[in-house]
Amino acid sequence: MRNSKETIDLLHEQYQFKQKKEKWKVHSFQLAIFILFFSGWEISSRQGWIDPLIFSSPSAVWRLLLEKLGDGSLLSHIGVTLFETVLGFLLGTFMGTCLAALLWWSNRLARILDPYLVILNAMPKVALGPILIVALGPSFISIIAMGAIISVIITTIVVYTAFQEVDENYTKVMKTFGAKKWVIFKEVILPASSPAIISTLKVNVGLSWVGVIVGEFLVSKVGLGYMIIYGFQVFNFTLVFLSLLIIAIFATLMYQGVELLEKKWTKGRT
């Protein structure tokens, strides 16, 4: 019995070692790709293999970053865009989930709205930007609305599908004990669909950034989207690349935050 336990412990240690080794390899390759990309970009710019005026260089972007941080202008742009994106992200996810719950509650409503959801999902949401600006005015409200609307429909479709795919046996058991529909939704449907909702959050991170940046392209006088447009207008592509890199960093941080939420939720269920 003791030998059996020691064998299991040894196998578990070997498994953990392999997992750590694999994780280290993945991180090493990720770091190597990162270094190669920026090194290649810098060398190509210095050697004239690419036009430094158009493609800039990491060193030029870094110098501009320090300059913008020094005068304090960059933080205000980041703050505005981050506020709009997070709010649009939360609103889009919340409204999409609520609409999905409404469709689950009423099969008739789901059948009525189904073709319209398909059509709206096929439409390029970015094209709604000018309409939102006219309807809501050229303000941060229209930008937040853009960040929310771009993710509402896909959230509704994905979450509603997850609601529909919950095992009917669970709901039948609840009905047998006389549970009301809202109790079934709260105790069975919503918890069982949590993985799909969290997966939707991951998708919505990118969609919200797209919606907000496009909104800032159209109306804003502040924000990272405005910095990109201004950079194009004055032919300052270093400013454009700086803005894009900042967007990439914060989008990654938001995505990592959702992944952390997913891990905590998974750990809480086990």
From Swiss-Prot:
Biological process (GO) annotations? transmembrane transport
Give the family from UniProt. Belongs to the binding-protein-dependent transport system permease family.
Record's bilayer topology term: Multi-pass membrane protein
Q: Which InterPro entries match?
A: MetI-like (IPR000515), MetI-like_sf (IPR035906)
> What organism is listed for this UniProt entry?
Bacillus subtilis (strain 168)
UniProt-annotated location(s): Cell membrane
Known function: Part of a binding-protein-dependent transport system. Probably responsible for the translocation of the substrate across the membrane.
The residue ranges crossing the membrane are 24-44, 85-105, 117-137, 140-160, 188-208, 209-229, 234-254
Its protein name is Uncharacterized ABC transporter permease protein YtlD
Q: Which GO terms describe its cellular component?
A: plasma membrane
The gene name reads ytlD
